[in-house]
């Protein structure tokens, strides 16, 4: 009888180095169903699943929703005195990407890496080349922590204003009746700085969202602006079976209710044939008017919502959690108290790196799942344009061949100009496959600021949280090894460093002359024998202690086992 590999793998002693002579290849789900891992997370440890609404549960259609926000913001600017010609602009989704930085001093849109090094610089619709960029940024570098000058446009809601800022700068720079200045533009005796223009745009965007007709127009045509996924009720019902589910949104109750009612508007329940359920029944806790990121700090007063009128009831809510009740305000501490959970019990799912992911992780220790809708297109380019990536690898090989037989004694200088030009051309072509600003995550070989934030703050990320449907709730999301250049470019072959390496490379922590070491330890022990300290030398651990990849906490597991045994007794 042949034992299946799934049975054999249950026993660690039977783990093979290869499978019947064939190298083991890790099974991976289809790319569009995948959840990607930055830090290992054991799903069976998660007791509560938290959701944001906008751009998470409710995904707004692109470019329709961005176009609506763009048009309404332009109309607002015109109503406060900006030129009527701006109404001719039409939102172009090919130009903006998230994670850009607006320089309020020079009016430039910047794409930067994690350290503030410039990757792309655009003034209006004009992309600046190296010499032009260095005129304003001599070191091609910005101080990212100068938040008074540099504003990061990180959210999906920022996309319309990102494009609008480019439109305004381009319009005022190239319109004959305005005179361009280094930090703004003039119209006769009137001067408008890029900083004040930026503030006008920010104020207009806020007005459109909070006082204008954006929400009203969205609700008038939900089918046009909001994605509806029939798998949503199924996933939430399965989450209900293994833990608690809660909703935390900055939106008010009336808007939330209409959006969520639409998302769950199916003739059946979680499965075809099952009875329809109201959206509130899928959540153990519902919080509106959350005011994130303040919600993850001191928060606001917790109040109860009258779901008939949408108004708030008088007084602070101090009672226990009641199923079906909708709350307003509160804080992340409130969530933990009402659900009886602690930080690492909670997996919070959202789209906003700062408002959802960074604050929930840094202040509460919640596990985090970042929704990145652009990932679908990024993966499409990564797979569909593989020939460009392969050509870059080939060019790198050609470059290495030119230097293959040269060392510090060589006077020969290989002509690498043609290879460099080709690398630049292929890299540019690759960037343009993503859009005018290139990939959300990289520019050539350099990762963007946005990519670094994803890796730093999101434990898991995917194009949609619906991808969790394709994993069991016992799944261990295990992070891959993040290789440094000396690991990713050096093959696993034995090299005797004593023969090959320079004598200057003397830091060896393993090849020790143990006889000499033991003698020195013996001498040291004799000289301080009267002191008798408990440990003279460290001992290598004999049990597994250096393990940080499995989302394990052995002490907690032992405590849980002890508690279960006590309950049985």
Curated annotation (Swiss-Prot):
Gene name linked to the record:
NT5C2
| Residue pairs linked by disulfide bridges in the UniProt entry | none
Q: Where is this region: Required for tetramer assembly?
A: 548-569
GO (cellular component) term, any one: cytosol
The molecule here is called Cytosolic purine 5'-nucleotidase
Question: Which GO terms fall under molecular function for this chain's record?
Answer: 5'-nucleotidase activity; ATP binding; GMP 5'-nucleotidase activity; identical protein binding; IMP 5'-nucleotidase activity; metal ion binding; nucleoside phosphotransferase activity; XMP 5'-nucleosidase activity
Organism encoding this protein: Gallus gallus
Record-stated family:
Belongs to the 5'(3')-deoxyribonucleotidase family.
According to the record, the protein's activity is controlled as follows: Allosterically activated by various compounds including ATP, 2,3-BPG/2,3-Bisphosphoglyceric acid and Ap4A/P1,P4-bis(5'-adenosyl) tetraphosphate. Binding of an allosteric activator is a prerequisiste to magnesium and substrate binding. Inhibited by inorganic phosphate. Inhibited by inosine, guanosine, p-chloromercuribenzoate and NaF.
Q: What superkingdom does the record give?
A: Eukaryota
Q: How does activity depend on pH?
A: Optimum pH is 6.5.
């Amino acid at each position: 009888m042949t034992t299946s590999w799934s049975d054999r793998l249950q026993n660690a002693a039977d783990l093979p180095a290869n499978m019947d002579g064939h190298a083991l290849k890790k099974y991976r789900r289809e790319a569009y169903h995948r959840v990607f891992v930055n830090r290992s997370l054991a799903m069976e440890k998660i007791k509560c699943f938290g959701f944001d609404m906008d751009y998470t549960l409710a995904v707004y259609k692109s470019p329709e929703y961005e176009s609506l926000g763009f048009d309404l913001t332009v109309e607002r600017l015109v109503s406060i005195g900006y030129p009527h010609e701006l109404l001719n602009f039409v939102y172009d989704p090919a130009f903006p990407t998230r994670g850009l930085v607006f320089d309020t001093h020079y009016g430039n849109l910047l794409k930067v890496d994690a350290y503030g090094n410039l990757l792309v610089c655009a003034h209006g619709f004009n992309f600046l080349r190296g010499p032009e960029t260095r005129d304003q940024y001599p070191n091609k570098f910005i101080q990212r922590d100068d938040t008074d000058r540099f504003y990061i446009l990180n959210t999906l809601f920022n996309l319309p204003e990102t494009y609008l800022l480019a439109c305004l700068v381009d319009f005022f720079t190239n319109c004959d009746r305005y005179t361009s200045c280094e930090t703004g533009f003039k119209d006769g005796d009137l001067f408008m700085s890029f900083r004040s223009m930026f503030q006008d745009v920010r104020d207009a965007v806020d007005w459109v969202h909070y006082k204008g007709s954006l929400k009203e127009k969205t609700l008038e045509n939900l089918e046009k602006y909001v994605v509806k996924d029939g798998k949503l009720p199924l996933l939430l019902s399965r989450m209900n079976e293994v833990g608690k589910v809660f909703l935390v949104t900055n939106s008010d109750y009336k808007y939330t209710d209409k959006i969520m009612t639409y998302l769950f508007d199916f003739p059946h329940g979680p499965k075809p044939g099952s009875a329809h359920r109201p959206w509130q029944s899928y959540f153990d806790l519902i919080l509106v008017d959350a005011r994130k990121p303040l919600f993850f700090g001191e928060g606001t007063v917790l109040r109860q919502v009258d779901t008939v009128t949408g108004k708030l009831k008088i007084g602070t809510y101090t009672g226990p959690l009641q199923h079906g009740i909708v709350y307003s305000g509160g804080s992340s501490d409130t969530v933990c108290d009402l659900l009886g959970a602690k930080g690492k019990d909670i997996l919070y799912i959202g789209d906003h790196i700062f408002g959802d992911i960074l604050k929930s992780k840094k202040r509460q220790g919640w596990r985090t799942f970042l929704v990145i809708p652009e990932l679908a297109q990024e993966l499409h380019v990564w797979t569909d344009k593989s020939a460009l990536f392969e050509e870059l690898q080939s060019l790198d090989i050609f470059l290495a061949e030119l230097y293959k037989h040269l060392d510090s004694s060589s006077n020969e200088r290989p002509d690498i100009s043609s290879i460099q030009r080709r690398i630049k051309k292929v890299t540019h072509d690759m960037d343009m496959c993503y859009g005018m600003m290139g990939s959300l995550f990289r520019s050539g070989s350099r990762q963007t600021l946005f990519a670094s934030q994803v890796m730093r703050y999101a434990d898991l990320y995917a194009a949609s949280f619906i991808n969790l449907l394709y994993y069991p709730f016992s799944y261990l999301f295990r992070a891959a090894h993040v290789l440094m250049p000396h690991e990713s470019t050096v093959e696993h072959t034995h090299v005797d460093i004593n023969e090959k390496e320079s004598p200057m490379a003397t830091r060896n922590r393993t090849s020790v002359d143990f006889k000499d070491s033991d003698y020195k330890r013996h001498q040291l022990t004799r000289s301080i024998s009267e002191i008798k300290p408990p440990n003279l030398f460290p001992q290598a651990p004999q049990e597994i202690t250096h393990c940080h990849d499995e989302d394990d906490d052995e002490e907690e597991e032992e405590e849980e086992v002890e508690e279960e045994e006590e309950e049985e007794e």
